[in-house]
UniProtKB/Swiss-Prot annotation:
Protein name stated in the entry: Bifunctional protein GlmU
Organism: Vibrio vulnificus (strain CMCP6)
Binding residues for UDP-N-acetyl-alpha-D-glucosamine: 8-11, 22, 73, 78-79, 100-102, 137, 151, 166, 224, 330, 348, 363, 374
UniProt KW keywords: Acyltransferase, Cell shape, Cell wall biogenesis/degradation, Cytoplasm, Magnesium, Metal-binding, Multifunctional enzyme, Nucleotidyltransferase, Peptidoglycan synthesis, Repeat, Transferase
NCBIfam families, per the entry: glmU, PRK09451.1
Active site (record annotation): 360
Cofactor: Mg(2+)
Residues that, per the record, bind acetyl-CoA: 377, 383-384, 402, 420, 437
Entry keyword S-adenosyl-L-methionine: no
Length: 453
């Protein structure tokens, strides 16, 4: 189905009390307007015309990679004026879909229904019935068909009783829409060029206006303040949690789970409370994620346990591993099968071999660790000299004692032992014991100093 979209995103968002354009405020980890753009691209829009105004530099920086045509609305003179700024780029025979950057939850299913419903030469309009329609434009019908939309400030008392309201989302053919936009005037209570006036223009020409309802009313809720944004965030998260539960994922409390990206899960996955998923995350069968964890762009294989309050980003974790609690796996971290990292361990750009362990208070950066190696508490790979990074290579079956500093670059061969408290600066051969601990000294009868009175 050939169509192009116009996304209106020029408003400042005064009630957000922010220096950032309203549509750049995030929902589920990405700007509201990007949700709308992604929906359009997913449906195969030929062109996406993004009408912007306030905070143009911020908008273009934040959305620099998006496939949009930038259309400036220098003065905000109404929705009709906004769409008209993009109209020179409309093809006469293409469907034009009008959407809003601050209405982020509009679904593909609803848009497809709207595109299908557009009558030849007429308009398909998305409407919804509200118990309290105050503030919205009212849908005026005459013996059934839609004949006009009247904004709240221009409505008479009878029209204010109408509960069917305009969402602003509509579809019309490019040539018709350009003609109707050219005929708009600003003779109304707000002195603006209303897009809604094209409904009456279409009716006056004898063209049909078809009203369509969204799959869910939440889809057409807009955001004008942070309370409304928070409401949509919770609605979105509830929907994501419901889908995961239906797919067999055990969410211990669906109300305390946030998905800000894409999550793929195997069978019998358990996720405890206050877990945040960002980017693309993959969890294998029987994976258990403890409370308060943050997972971003990572892969965790079967039968692995991630204990509470661990942060995993850009890392891969093998099968039968244990992570945490309070572990940080940074980009480039790789845990092979049956490896363990424990509390207050940080791993960056390092591989931990099969069966190896670093259970306490350790930093492993720019390192390769072989199989069945034990890293004692307080071990640090000293990988940075203030200008360059250097690598530490540790072989199989190595024992590194507690409170050791491994000053890279260096290699520790298979089976070596590093005594506790060692500062290591040179390579260690296979099977060697290295210890640099200072000689122990005992002072008999030592008396601690006392405070002066």
């Amino acid at each position: 189905m050939k169509f192009s979209a116009v996304i209106l995103a020029a408003g400042k968002g005064t009630r957000m009390y922010s220096n950032m354009p309203k549509v750049l405020h995030t929902l589920a980890g990405k700007p509201m307007v990007k949700h709308v753009i992604d929906t359009c691209t997913g449906l195969g829009a030929q062109n996406i015309h993004l009408v912007y105004g306030h905070g143009g530099d911020q908008m273009q920086a934040a959305l620099a990679e998006e496939p949009v045509n930038w259309v400036l609305q220098a003065e905000q003179l109404g929705t009709g004026h906004a769409v008209d700024q993009a109209s020179p780029q409309f093809e006469d025979d293409e469907k034009i879909l009008v959407l809003y950057g601050d209405v982020p939850l509009i679904s593909s299913e609803t848009i497809e229904s709207l595109l299908d419903a557009q009558p030849k030469g007429g308009i398909a309009l998305l409407t919804v019935v509200l118990d309290n329609p105050t503030g919205y434009g009212r849908i005026v019908r005459k013996n059934g068909p839609v004949v006009a939309i009247v904004e709240q400030k221009d409505a008479n008392e009878e029209q204010k009783l109408i509960k069917e309201i305009n969402t602003g989302v509509m579809v019309a053919t490019g040539g018709d829409l350009k003609r109707w936009l050219a005929g708009l005037n600003n003779d109304n209570a707000q002195g603006e060029y209303y897009l809604t006036d094209v409904i009456a223009a279409a009716h006056d020409e004898g063209n049909a206006v078809e009203a369509v309802h969204p799959v869910s009313p939440i889809e057409v809720e807009g955001v004008n303040d942070r309370a409304q944004l928070a409401r949509l965030e919770r609605a979105f998260q509830a929907a994501q949690a419901k889908k995961l539960l239906e797919q067999g994922v055990m969410l211990r409390d669906p109300a305390r789970f946030d998905l800000r990206g894409e999550l793929q899960c195997g069978l019998d996955v358990e996720i405890d409370v206050n877990v945040i998923i960002e980017g693309n995350v993959s969890l294998g069968d029987n994976v258990v994620i403890g409370a308060g964890c943050v997972l971003k762009d990572c892969e965790i294989d079967d039968n692995t346990i991630v204990r509470p309050y661990s942060v995993i980003e850009g890392a891969t974790v093998g099968e039968q591993c244990t992570v945490g609690p309070f572990t940080r796996l940074r980009p480039g971290a790789e845990m092979r099968n049956d490896s363990h990292v424990g509390n207050f361990v940080e791993v960056k750009n390092a591989r931990i071999g099969e069966g190896s362990k670093a259970n306490h208070l350790t930093y492993l950066g720019d390192a390769e660790i072989g199989q069945r190696t034990n890293i004692g508490a307080g071990t640090i790979t000293c990988n940075y000299d203030g200008a360059n990074k250097f690598k530490t290579i540790i072989g199989n079956d190595v024992f590194v004692g507690s409170d050791s500093q491994l000053v890279a670059p260096l290699t520790i061969a298979d089976g070596a032992t590093i005594g506790a408290g060692t500062t290591l600066t040179k390579d260690v051969a296979e099977g060697e014991l290295v210890i640099t601990r200072a000689k122990e000294r005992k002072v008999t009868g030592w008396q601690r100093p006392v405070k002066k009175k």
